[in-house]
From Swiss-Prot:
Database matches in InterPro entries: 6-blade_b-propeller_TolB-like, PD40, Tol-Pal_TolB, TolB_N
Subcellular location: Periplasm
UniProtKB keywords: Cell cycle, Cell division, Periplasm, Signal
Leader peptide range in chain numbering: 1-22
Region: Disordered, residue numbers: 406-428
Pfam families: PD40 (PF07676), TolB_N (PF04052)
Subunit structure: The Tol-Pal system is composed of five core proteins: the inner membrane proteins TolA, TolQ and TolR, the periplasmic protein TolB and the outer membrane protein Pal. They form a network linking the inner and outer membranes and the peptidoglycan layer.
One Gene Ontology term, aspect cellular component: periplasmic space
Protein name per Swiss-Prot or TrEMBL: Tol-Pal system protein TolB
Length: 428
């Protein structure tokens, strides 16, 4: 399969045969050697519920790469509260932390009581009662995972966030495309748009309420914004040539994009309310894939003005662009870490295309993945993981890797091709 450079032309992406509306399932591919051992005891009264809260929490923490849940068969007892815990038993299992709890059904409303215990310190770190409806049990489990993750690591958990992605069904020239949104673990997939023309580059608004994307539904590319709550759609651009790579400003008032209406693809910024356009770059090269810095004062973008695709930074105050990447002959699709201290990108070496991280203070680049056909990285809002598209055999799947490369997992669809992932902001 020939690699298509999204930075180079009209952002056309031909997807292989697949399903347009299927939940993704997580497959852990690599665990971290520094993962923290934690025992998550099945919650009392929780086995017969439509969602296994304890198992969801265990899966969440494991795929973060920060934790290694003990296998259920190794648990020597099943306490449901801290009063029932014999800490020496769990010390023998080399577990640093212990999660216990119980679930009570109170007339169709579920009362989830959980505790996080420090095994070596023999003390309770966290305890809470969460009230949930039957339909919200999975959401409640993700919430509990977020609280445990933050209590131990000091980093806000991102298990209650969402991902957007593009799938396709059909073969040959008869392909149906779909834009879907799912929980960060691939469950609760909901299709928000279907089309017999390509859909590309989904991008979340800062408040998580809208998606911008590129659709070819009129026969040529246009940039659209869709309200996820109401389904209302607005077409913002449909110029001749390329209309691609929308990126929201941190305040949600502007979209950066790549347009070729004046010749070569250049970076523009649109004020969404007024539709006023401001052209930023002026070059004979291809400039595309803009991304706003978290502070809103600059953007990064991909350009081949040096002869090969590299990542540049455009300062909105001075109007100057500077090259950021010098390692290797191909670096594209730059994405900031939430703190703005690093960028994640696709880089090419002799073995293929990989997700990499570059520290902006030292300029040191680290390749994070060992797959050879990676593209479209998107960073979790807490900066701990990066989701991306890659190849598994002849199929496109989604992968994720920790920010330091120590842990990874895949989110393949049951069949078919999945592309263009975008991780949501925190959904408060």
């Amino acid at each position: 399969m020939k690699r298509l450079n999204l930075w180079a032309a009209s952002l056309l992406l031909m997807l292989c045969a697949g399903m347009a509306h299927a939940e993704l399932t997580i497959e852990i591919t690599k665990g971290s050697d520094q993962a923290i051992p934690i025992a998550i005891v099945p919650m009392a009264n929780g086995d017969d519920l439509p969602e296994n809260v304890s198992r969801i929490v265990s899966n969440d923490l494991e795929r973060s790469g920060r934790f290694e849940p003990l296998p259920r068969e190794s648990l020597i007892s099943r306490p449901s509260s801290s009063e029932e815990v014999h800490y020496q038993d769990w010390q023998q299992l080399d577990s640093d932390y212990l999660v216990v709890g119980k679930i009570d059904n109170q007339g169709g409303e579920y009362r989830i009581q959980y505790e996080l215990l420090n095994v070596n310190g023999q003390n309770r770190m966290l305890g809470e009662v969460v009230t949930s409806s039957r339909d919200q049990l999975r959401d409640s489990a993700h919430y509990i995972s977020d609280q445990i993750f933050e209590e131990i690591t000091g980093i806000r958990g991102a298990f209650s966030t969402s991902i957007a992605y593009v799938t396709a069904s059909g073969v040959g020239d008869d392909i149906d495309y779909a834009l879907s949104v799912a929980d960060a673990d691939g469950h609760n997939s909901q299709q928000i748009l279907s089309s017999d023309e390509p859909i590309l580059s989904p991008a979340w608004s800062p408040d998580g309420g809208k998606l911008a994307y590129v659709s070819f539904e009129t026969g040529r590319p246009g940039i659209y914004v869709q309200n996820l709550a109401t389904g209302q759609r607005v077409r913002l651009t449909s110029f001749e040539g390329i209309n691609g790579a929308p990126a929201w400003s941190p305040d949600g008032r502007k979209l950066a994009m790549s347009l070729s209406k004046d010749g070569q693809p250049e970076i523009y910024v649109m004020d969404i309310a007024s539709r006023d356009l401001r052209r930023l770059t002026q070059s004979d090269a291809i400039d595309t894939e803009p991304e706003w810095a978290p502070n809103g004062r600059s953007l990064i973008f991909t350009s081949d003005r040096s002869g090969n695709p590299q990542i540049y930074r455009y300062d909105l105050g001075s109007g100057r662009a500077e090259r950021l990447t010098f390692t290797g002959s191909y670096n594209s699709r730059g994405r900031f870490s939430p703190d703005g201290d690093a960028i994640f990108m696709v880089t090419r070496d002799d073995s293929g295309y990989h997700v990499a991280r570059q520290d902006l203070d030292t300029d040191r680049m680290t390749i994070l993945t060992d797959s050879d056909w990676d593209e479209s990285p998107s960073v979790a809002p807490n900066g701990t993981m990066v989701i991306f598209a890659t190849q598994e055999g002849t199929r496109g799947v989604l992968g994720a890797v920790s920010a330091d490369g120590s842990a990874s997992f895949r989110l393949p669809s049951p069949q078919g091709d999945v592309r263009e992932p975008a991780w949501s902001p925190f959904l408060d």
